[in-house]
């Protein structure tokens, strides 16, 4: 977090509360990266005064997924881009909308799809997340991949609305969870709509012998505790 604070203090007009919010996001965003099989870069607008239009953006944080290979071999933290050089980042900051309909771009040997997500806090967009995925890995997703991505998209929508992570609650996850260890998805009634293979194995080791999907998680937990 020391590097994050240094970058924010030197090139941006981010306030103390905004900086705290970005630290909360970075503390929990491994989950976002893993669920979307993507590298994430956090961009903050560069400007000398809050009343001035940004001259560009600076990358203040970067996370690589544990569920897929990275698309960035070199460190990108501290990189700067001028306004207009990355229109999708500009647009997410200006409009507050998630920018998804972008054409893949070739970077080295990889065809990379970029999406940008505004980070909303107290009535304004304070930063932008750029999400970078290998387009080749997106062509034939299975049930697990589709569920991961759908969950990720819900969480990114919450980020754009200022609802994830929960404010001033500390990190939700201690230690930081690995999606690959097992994931369960619930519907609004608490019923399991999807359980990854590792999640099923974990419940099996606890003594559960039936199907998980379609069952109420609370009822399942009561039977294995």
Each model region followed by its residue ranges:
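Sensory coupling linkers of modular signal transduction proteins
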Residues: 129-169
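Extracytoplasmic/periplasmic sensory segments of membrane signal-transduction proteins
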Residues: 11-66
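PAS-family sensory domains
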Residues: 10, 45-46, 52-85, 144-152, ...
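Soluble sensory domains of the PAS superfamily and closely related sensory modules
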Residues: 24, 33-35, 83-99, 155, ...
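Sensory modules in modular signal-transduction proteins
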Residues: 21-41, 160-195, 199
